[in-house]
Swiss-Prot record:
Name of protein: tRNA 2-selenouridine synthase
Family the UniProt entry places it in: Belongs to the SelU family.
Active site: C97
Organism name: Escherichia coli O1:K1 / APEC
EC code: 2.9.1.3
GO terms, molecular function: transferase activity, transferring alkyl or aryl (other than methyl) groups; tRNA 2-selenouridine synthase activity
Length: 364
């Protein structure tokens, strides 16, 4: 059974999105996993904890014996069935545990006894994690062009359309503002970093690129933060600023935050609960910046939001949202972004409307 254990092998796994059958306990998987991994644990959280205590108190032989006792009979058969099905569904996949130790070797041996030869990651998740960290450090050294602009300028779409673009907000499952959450929960920090590394590796392998095109992000995107190596390089990067007309920005924001989010919530939860979730999402976003708006202004905008939601519910029209969105942009988001941009004005190398910036970026 051929094992993979070189740095290039690990990178190749990430670039190819090789399916990984991760046999660590769910708690370990939730703390950090590779993008193409599925969690089919040898031991659940309680079993792993019991074996860990036994190991500390009685040593490795006793812990191993306890593990075999806990994962036996019907439990073992159920897990074998799941591993067998996953192997057949992913014939070019690979097994992985924490460090390429006993857990992945035990599962590999059991599968072999059942007639399935399946490789494993020699260094386990730890080796893949170190590969992801190192790849991000190395690839971050390439030049970066940042796409800046006020809310609603279509920065994310512009980045997505570049062959050398990496959509940081898409990877983080958050659009980076008080209203930025999506219906997908954010990943753990380690899983986000692993996903980012894999995306950078794949993009670089496709393009052999000279520079990255990224959105001008702050350090935090929701609950995830950018790796320090990348964030440091972004602070040194040149910036192209999208300056679209206010009306165009409003159209984009209406589509993204009202029409699309309402559709997504109702698609996920059904009409009634979806509407409630959508309303709560908008109110939560406004509430998140209550302190910065001031109580009086917040109450005024919240009342306008309620009125807009009533209109949307009864007529289907989202036009009423302009009554609170326009002042929110004019009084809060636009001044905040312009202030931030002023502090790095010397890094701005191009300004223009969306199509002009897109054309300029392609020429770089």
């Amino acid at each position: 059974m051929q094992e993979r254990h070189t740095e290039q092998d690990y990178r190749a796994l990430l670039i190819a999105d090789t399916p990984i059958i991760d046999v660590r306990a769910p708690i370990e998987f939730e703390q950090g996993a590779m993008p193409a991994a599925i969690n089919l644990p040898l031991m659940n959280n309680d079993e792993r904890a019991a074996v860990g205590i036994c190991y500390k108190q009685q040593g490795s032989d006793a812990a191993l014996a306890l593990g075999h006792k806990l994962v036996a009979g019907e439990i073992r058969q159920q897990r074998m069935d799941a591993w067998r099905a996953a192997c057949l569904q992913n014939p070019h996949g690979i097994l992985c545990c924490a460090r390429g130790g006993q857990r992945s070797h035990i599962v590999q041996r059991w599968l072999h006894d059942a007639g399935i030869d399946y490789p494993l990651v020699e260094g386990g998740y730890k080796a893949l994690r170190q590969t992801a960290i190192q790849a991000t450090i190395e690839l971050s050294q390439k030049p970066i062009v940042l796409i800046g602009g006020c809310t609603g300028c279509g920065k994310t779409l512009l980045v997505q359309q570049q062959p050398n673009g990496v959509d940081l907000e898409g990877l983080a499952r958050h659009r980076g503002s008080a209203f930025g959450r999506t219906l997908q929960p954010q990943l753990s920090q380690a899983s986000f970093e692993n996903l980012l590394a894999a995306e950078m590796l794949k993009t670089d392998a496709r393009q052999n690129l000279r520079l990255w095109v990224l959105e001008d992000e702050s350090r935090m995107i929701g609950s995830n933060h950018l790796p320090e190596c990348l964030r440091e390089r972004m602070t040194q990067a040149t910036i192209a600023v999208v300056e679209d007309p206010f009306e165009i920005r409003l159209e984009r924001l209406n589509e993204e935050y009202f029409l699309r989010m309402h559709h997504d919530f109702t698609h996920a939860y059904g009409d009634e609960q979806g509407w409630q979730e959508y309303c709560e999402y908008l109110h939560h976003g406004l509430s998140a910046i209550k302190r910065r708006l001031g109580l009086q202004r917040y109450n005024e905008l919240a009342a306008r939001l309620d009125a807009a939601l009533t209109t949307q519910l009864t007529t289907g029209s989202t036009d009423g949202h302009l009554a609170w969105l326009v002042p929110l942009l004019e009084e809060y988001y636009d001044p905040m972004y312009r202030y931030q941009l002023e502090k790095k004005a010397e890094k701005v190398v191009f300004r223009g409307e969306w199509a002009e910036v897109a054309e300029w970026v392609k020429a770089q």
